Structures are given as structure tokens and as C-alpha cells.
């Protein structure tokens, strides 16, 4: 998601956003307040100190994100609480980061727990400078940070023990939550924490040799698994405050439309309804919020509203018309992301002409969007599963007319997100603030939870964009590509955002073209068109690779099939010696699957794909068939190269989850469509996500490595659909050029 954004660009982009006059927009932010640094020395014992109170005590040379006090709490009983600087929404980051810190701390893992950090600057991503979760960067960007935090905390505990026993710290060692000294002396971390927290924080610390790891690299159960499996884990949707009310919002059927007339008499008559409020929405639209005692009366009242919408001033997209426009646009000249000589196309012995269509897709997290806002005399408090609590908190301050430091963010566990919980405009958070503000103006002095239904979520916009690809490829009898003329048409997800001026170059959004450049050495001319469409779009799990990987990996199979080459051998030849991680992942998947060594049951075929995204490589070898005219995925064998596997069990889960989401893209009904400007889907009855009955058998294998870990939240998604499609094409002889699959 954020892998194309350079670390130097993100603070500049946010500074640009924050420098605007607050009167210009409700999302205006103030840079000085938002980026205020806070720090503290020592280990926190009991409750965390407020970081800003000890800012002047921070050791020179250490940022707040490098000091253990914000991240490690050791209770007298030895329980270690690790604060994570990311949102946990199913990817296992709470466990992974806690493992990394606990490894260097030599903590007793049975006494380790993890909690979310706040929007404070101490919890900023060490690369990007703000608190965010995205781009599969969590473990990748914080691996060294959390190792050093654990090592600093351990060094302080050793110093505390050395002072207590009046010995040199070099004579001491640690083991599972204890400091061990000469003569059999020992002290638990809980006994030493109070003294350790008063000591200076060491700037330079020695880290373990990876060969000495006892926790990192070990398949470990997640810290939150027990509560989740027993229904005890609370999510943002579960927040309950004294006197809390619930709001639902009636939004226009066409994006950007405004309210023309309203009859709310029937809605107000429903028992439990407290207010019906007209509020501003994202993209200049208007909506109507119903505030009530609970969700059911609020929903009943919303259903009872009689609303008329003015759609005269907004464009009304239509899926069929859009696709025709995209096809016309693909014929036009446009900016080039890559260039090459296309003259060999005219005389190429073999050619392929292909068009691919990828629909709009909803994120559809299991927990719909929600945000609880409490307005207080001191400012405001928000409870929300935010991927960027610093940005969302500052945006909330702008909407409420407060200073950023007057807004307190309580980051909640989230039930999935896939990119939807990080919007550069903080749209759903600002909406909740507008509801709370309007409720206060109506005389309501209570916390208000704004809750989206599944229908609100599916129809609410911010989709993966519709994309059209066209490719004309010339190649010889050996499969050597002589020329590849490629056109991509699709909305830019960064256009109109704070990131546009930094990450859209020459009219080309880099997130749209990722996956078309590497790893294969191809003479490609790539033309890109980004049309303006009245559909809000956003990054979606694995971003551009959701469509580019499919195009590249299915076309490579087409070339291999046309030249009678084994698709694995063909890929290996193209990869050469320049991409050893791709080769290792692909070979591992091939070896573990039995590809080419054992016969498949009648009616089944192999499919292969390999793709790098977010600095990790995933290769799939799949078994598939066609039953009653429908494609069936039976088995998936994965080869994964993500460098050091911090928690192999979590990586296995991420690969499986991403693959199932990739499978969803292939299934009939997995598309958002428009007619006269309105979204035609509303729930899982007409918007398909894979069910348990669709899921294949999985085997996930990881290439051993001691190099620093790379991202794993998203890389398992892109190669699944092309591997599946390649297997079906082996059976039918016909390539699949459109998602979801159509075998008619």
C-alpha cells in the first residue's frame, strides 16, 4: 500500500496537508501539534507515564520511538506488556512484534502480552515518521526497532541487578525473565523493573546473533488467539461507554449527491430515536444521521426516512458505459511508464493479442466501519480501529475545531481492513465526528458510535479500481519476447490525495503499474491512462499487483503453451541468475507439490505463478478442475521467500488468508457494478467472497533465510488467481481474460 512512498516523502506530504488554513477544510491539520515529539526514559512500571511529561529527560541521540518506556511495561509479578505501534486486524502483528522484543529482552514468553499504542509520535513508523499500518511494512520496518527496544530494556535490567549486587554487569546474564549472577544469585525482571526505570537508557546496544534466537523463527501461537476463539476479544464495534448512543447514516445513492428534501416524521416517532440530523459527507455530499438508543431503532428510523436526492450535478457512472470508454481510451496515445522498440512486432513469428478486464472490488472486512466519539470539556476521545491514528486524530481535530493534542485516540482491535481503514481524507472518522458534533448541537451530551451496516460498507465506495489491460506481444519459436506493447487504463488511487504530488509522476500512478516491470526482462512499451470517474477508489490488499500479476503470469503461460514449453522451465529461464529469491520460492513450491513427478487425478491440471510484492516472493503450484462448468480449486502449494520468518505460523496464516482473498476475485459475483450511478451490490448475497466450501487444501513452505524480514500481509494474494487461471487454461485450452472467471 505504502511501499511506493519514500520515507522522505510521507512527512512532506503530511506537512503539506497540515499547513493548510483550518478554515479551508474540516480535515486541515496543524503540523507543529501533530508532529510534536514526546519521550521518556527508563522502563515503565505499573501504568505508563504520559510520554510528553518526561520529554526533557530523553537521552540525546534517541528518538521517542527508540526508548523502551513507551513500549515495555514490566509488572512486579514479572508480566511483560509490549506496546505495538501497529493496528492488529488479523495479520498477527501484535504477536510478531512482541516476539521480536521479547527475544532480545530474554523475557518469559508465557508472561508476555501485547496492547495497541496510541496516536502519540512515539508509535510512529520508524521509516515513515507517522503511526500507520499498511504496505505490509509492520514487521519489515519495525524489526530492528523492536530488537533494539528489547535489548535496551535488558541492558537496563542488567545494570539494575549489577548495582544491587555491586558487581560488574559483564558478570551477569539473563534467562526467561530473570537476571542471573555469580554465586547462584538471581532476580526476576519484576523485582528489578522499578530500579531499572530510573537508569539512563543506553544508546548503543549489542543484538543477538540470529543463531542464538530461541523465539524468533519458532512457530508460535498468537497472543490474541485464545480470546478470539472464545468470543472474548473486543473490537471497535464492541465499544460500550456509559450513556452511549448509536448512529447510522443515510448516504446518497450516487457519490457526491446532496439532499433535496426530507420527511423525517415517521423516523422521529420510533421509540428510542433521539435525533435526526443533516450532516456533511465526504466528496461534497450530504447525509442524514439518525441517533438512537441502539442500532435497531436507529436502523428502523433510517429505513423510515423519506429522502429525495439531487443528483443533477454529479456524474452517474455505468459499468457497461465505463468499459466502453476505457476501450476507446486504450486506443489513444498517453503517457509512457516504459518504452521500447515496437518494430519487431510486425515481423514476429508468433503474436498474442489480449484484453483483460478487472472490476471494481469492495474491501468487505468482516467488521464494518465504526467509530465512537465522546466530546468532553477537554476536547474529544475516539475509539476506532484506525490504520493511522495520528492522521485520523488530527483530521478529527480539524472536523471538531480542536487542536490535535485535544483529541485522544483509543486504537481498537479491528476485524479486517485490507486498506479500507486507512483513507488519506480520514473520511469515515470525520463522518463520525460530524455526527457527534451535530448531536451535541442538538442538545445530546453522550458518546455516539457511528456504525456502518454491511450494506453501507458494500455501497460506501473506496473500491479497488476498475482496470483494463491490452497487450500485443511478439515472440519467436523459443518464447523469446521480441516486443511487448501494453496499455493500462484505470483510475489513480492517489489522484486528489495528499500523496499525488509526490507519487504520481508524469501523470502515472506508480501503484497502478507495479508488477509490470519486474522480474522478467521484457522489451515493453507501457502506456497508462488514468480517467476521472465519479467513484472513490482506494488501495486494496496488494494494490496494483491484484491485476498486474494476473496479466503477466497468465500471458507468460500463454507464450509457454504456444511454444510447447513447460511453464516452470520457461519462467526459470526468464528469471536467469538475476532473481534467486524468485527461483528459490518457485522451486520450493514445485518440489513440495510433486509437480511433474506424480500424475494428477483425471480432470485435474497444474497451474503455476510466481510474483514479488512488498519485497517478498510467493510462488504457487495449484491443482484445479472444472465441475459442471465451474472452476474448482483443489490444492495450493506455496513457496514463500520473505527472508527471516519471525513467526512461521503467522506467515502460513497470512498466505492462506491472502490466497483465499485472491480466490474470491475469481468466483462469480465478485464484482462491484454500477447502473445510473448506483452500486448494484449490497451484501454477501450479491457480492461474493469465498466460503469455507470454496477453500482448497493448503501447504505453505518457507525458504530458510537469516536476512531481515520482508512484508507478508499481502504478497500471498497476487499469484493465486493467475495460477488458478493457468490450471483452467491447461484443461480448456482457452485463457481466462476477465475476472471473475467466465467459462461460458
Predicted feature locations:
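Short beta-strand elements
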Residues: 70-74, 233, 371-375, 468-477, ...
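N-terminal secretory signal peptides
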Residues: 1-29
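Conserved beta-alpha junction segments in alpha/beta enzyme cores
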Residues: 55-96, 100, 233, 347-400, ...
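Thiamine diphosphate
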Residues: 94-99, 394, 413, 417-440, ...
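N-terminal export signals
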Residues: 20, 27, 33-54
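Glycine-rich loop/linker segments at domain edges
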Residues: 2-12, 121-142, 194-238, 335-371, ...
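N-terminal amphipathic, basic-rich helices that act as targeting or association modules
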Residues: 153-155, 159-307, 630-637, 642-665, ...
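C-terminal catalytic domains of large/alpha subunits in multi-subunit enzymes
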Residues: 102-133, 160-187, 261, 269, ...
